Each structure stands twice: as C-alpha cells, then as structure tokens.
Amino acid sequence: MTAESMMFNGAVLLMVLVLVGLAWGFLLLKIQGGEAE
C-alpha cells in the first residue's frame, strides 16, 4: 500500500465517521426533543 492510498482510505473513513456521527447526534436530539414535548 502506498502512502497516497492510505491517506485516501483515511479520508474516506473519516468522512463516513463524520456523517454517521452527525446522523446519530441528530437522531438522539430528535428523540429527546420528542420526549420533552
């Protein structure tokens, strides 16, 4: 594996983790907001 492919894989993995984190956080906020009301 070259350094370039490792950097590319790392960037893709980071993007996926960020998207999953945002979706998870949004879902938790939505659930908590629904319970509050």
Swiss-Prot record:
The chain crosses the membrane at residues 11-29. It is found in: Cellular thylakoid membrane. SUPFAM superfamilies: PetM subunit of the cytochrome b6f complex. InterPro entries: PetM_cyt_b6/f_cplx_su7 (IPR012595). It is a single-pass membrane protein. GO terms for cellular component: cytochrome b6f complex; plasma membrane-derived thylakoid membrane. One of its GO terms (molecular function) is electron transfer activity. Component of the cytochrome b6-f complex, which mediates electron transfer between photosystem II (PSII) and photosystem I (PSI), cyclic electron flow around PSI, and state transitions. The 4 large subunits of the cytochrome b6-f complex are cytochrome b6, subunit IV (17 kDa polypeptide, PetD), cytochrome f and the Rieske protein, while the 4 small subunits are PetG, PetL, PetM and PetN. The complex functions as a dimer. This is Cytochrome b6-f complex subunit 7. It comes from Rippkaea orientalis (strain PCC 8801 / RF-1). The gene is petM.
